[in-house]
């Protein structure tokens, strides 16, 4: 399925005899291999969910870190600038921008970030650092209070991650 363009791997597609899912913690990055051992990409693991892996990169040399986040944010920015005259839009659409579980809304110099899975939660500081490097924002707010987080075993919270978000934007 991954070779056909899918970005998720279901737990029933994993040979758990060869690679037991319980050996991974939620949010671990791993190299996904085909049955013959050919690397298919880097994935973020959610071993206790039906969707047990989400593709981060087809190149096994590119783990999800600040450098890859900066690159993906720049690509997303380039695409949005073609569509919008003003900087008020959804900058990151999760899997559509190859950042599964991440949504970033831009309101001029203010950014609201939603994280929906453990893989993105693990790199939350790098997400903020990448946003600061690319955009030099006034403020970044984490609005992580969706019900989907509970399904992933994540706590809900809303907090300023960088700067101070005004009451209204």
Regions found by a protein language model. Name each.
Residues 1-107, 166-167:
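Non-catalytic accessory regions of SAM-dependent methyltransferases
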Residues 44, 116, 145:
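Surface loops and adjacent helix of pleckstrin homology
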Residues 49-51, 120-123:
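A short local loop/turn or secondary-structure capping micro-motif enriched for an aromatic residue
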Residues 51-52, 61-62, 110-111, 131-134, ...:
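Short, low-complexity, polar/charged sequence segments that are solvent-exposed and flexible
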Residues 94-105, 121-169:
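Non-catalytic substrate-recognition/targeting regions of SAM-dependent transferases
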Residues 108-121:
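A short interface-forming secondary-structure element
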